[in-house]
Structures are given as structure tokens and as C-alpha cells.
Amino acid sequence: SATYTVKVVSDSGNKYRFNNFGTSAVTLDLAEGGTYTFDGSDSSMSGHPFVIGTAANGTVYSTGVTYQLDGVSVTYSAYTSGYASASTRKLIITVPASAPVLYYWCSIHSGMGGQINTNSTLGSSNFDGSTQTIVKANTTAGFSIVSYSGNDTSGSTIGHGLGVVPQITIIKRRIASEDWMVGIGHILGSGKEGHYVKLNATEAEG
């Protein structure tokens, strides 16, 4: 479960952007059974009612969806008609089991949104780093599983959903054969942040 703040930015036309992430109209991943709040209270959203459907700019999806304006639950028609004049605007969805592929879009203008993939095991989109991730986290246990596509950019960061820096990170490449890298820098102490060992290998710590 998560809350995403939504705003509209100019990016080859108006586009939705989540949590001030650097990319617009991204594909979202939401976990079945999770509850997600899309907060469209930013002033840029006033003329762009944020809705979810089963097709891009198409049929509205209502299963598990609640619309709120100024803290009051309203119908879909009241939500879209009163969106611009409301101070706070939220769409809340609890993703049902076996939910279809969904889409988020503006009920007035086309071309602003993107796709929503739903899943039963992977987790949900995270925008805390410079690279978008899919995170399934257990903050009580201090453990999370993160999936992402790297961009070979030095200094890139990823969100992990734990709220604190993890002491150990284990990285497994999915598109090539390579030993699992285990980051141990935070155990070794200050100045050792980049150090790691490899599972199934005999090299020294690097």
C-alpha cells in the first residue's frame, strides 16, 4: 500500500507525474490486495480529473475504487464535475485479486496517463530514488525485495521502501549470468560503503 502525489507537468503536452519523479506518464505496478491513494490536490491538477479505467481514455474501472473531494466520498460523476473546485482530491483503490491491466488517465483530456500493471507477488511502484523500482517491503522485519532496470548511470539511486539505510544488500542480475553481489559496506563501517562480496565466488572482498 502507498500514497502517490500526482501533478501535471508539461512534457510534450500535459502529462501526469508521481511523487515529483523525473519521468512522466510512467507505467505503474500495483499489488493485488494493496490499497493505493492517488492524491491530486496539487494546483496543477484542478482541470485534469485523475481516473482509472480498463482502457486508455476509455471505460472507467470502479471495483475497489473510492473517490474523495475535500475529505468526503462522492460518486464518479460528482468527482469529475467537482474536481476543479475542490481543495483536496483523492482517488483510492484497493486492487482486487486477478484485477485486469488498468490505465490512468484524465477524464477530460487524452494522452496524459499510462498503464497500470497489477500483480499478486511483486509489490508496487516506488519513486524514492532516481530509478523507478517495484518494491515489496516488510518494514517490521527490515527486509524488502526490489526489482528495477539499471541505466548504467553513475550515482543512480533506488528506493527500497524501508525508510532506513539497509545494512546488507543482495543484487542478482536477471538478464545475464553472474554471481550474486552482497553489499556489506554499512557493516564494515564508515568509508566502506562501496564494498561487497560475491556469493558462489572465491574472490576477496572488493
PLM regions and their residue ranges:
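Extracellular/periplasmic metallocenter environments
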Residues: 45-47, 72-121
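Residues within well-ordered beta-strands of beta-sheet-rich folds
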Residues: 29, 35-39, 92-94, 103-107, ...
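Acidic glycine-/aspartate-rich tracts in secreted/extracellular proteins
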Residues: 10-14, 41-46, 54-59, 97-100, ...
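Negatively charged
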Residues: 30-33, 68, 77-80
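Charged, alpha-helix-forming regions
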Residues: 121-206
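Short strand-edge motifs at loop-to-beta-strand transitions and within beta-strands
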Residues: 26, 89-93, 156
